[in-house]
Amino acid sequence: VLDVGTGTAQIPVELCRQNKECRVIAIDMAAHMLDLARFNIEVDGFTQRIYLQQIDAKDMDFEQDMFDCVISNSIIHHIPAPRSVLQESIRVVRPGGLLFFRDLMRPESDEEVSRLVEMYAGAENPHQQQMFDDSLRAALSLEEIREMVTSLGFRDDMVQATSDRHWTWTDRMQDN
């Protein structure tokens, strides 16, 4: 499994907890996030199954068709040119392999942004509220991610709104 934008590596840790055979390469550009990830992996005892690398997701130094599965949670809205991350992920997943991307979904109005910030970050400090507001505004809309997925040769109906603030794209690479 390749985890793109692993952050603190909570998802790879959970994958390894649930599947004794799972091995994960977890990448992130932020050194401070990888430091937190390294700590979490050590605490949970998965240093032999989760491998961290500081890599730019837009230009991954992995062989084509290398991974059975590529996952990514909440990184797309942080990347100015997200299409390149999707292209690279498609390149490195093997035929028949799984693609799983989830991210924030940009609301259709300022009022909806405010409502979501209040609902999900209302108890947080103003800085955290602003970060969530900024993230929602930076996110792709459902229509934008569907258009992007279609332009990459995949079906747009494989991208779904999975909450009031998230979209999820799950698909399999076609066998050659």
Residue ranges and their predicted role:
Residues L2-V4, A9-D59:
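Class I SAM-dependent methyltransferase SAM/SAH-binding core
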Residues K58-C69:
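A short acidic, Gly/Pro-enriched loop at the edge of an enzyme's catalytic core
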Residues T168-N176:
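C-terminal lobe and adjacent flexible extensions of AdoMet/dcAdoMet transferase-like proteins
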Residues G97-D103:
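Conserved beta-strand signature within the Rossmann-like core of class I S-adenosyl-L-methionine
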Residues H32, I79-S84:
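Short N-terminal helix/helix-N-cap motif within the alpha/beta-hydrolase-1
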Residues S84-P95:
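A short glycine-rich, Lys/Arg-flanked "PGG" loop and its adjoining helix->strand segment in the class I
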Residues C69-A81:
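A short SAM/SAH-binding and catalytic strip from SAM-dependent methyltransferases
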Residues L104-T168:
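C-terminal alpha-helical "lid/dimerization" subdomain adjacent to the S-adenosyl-L-methionine
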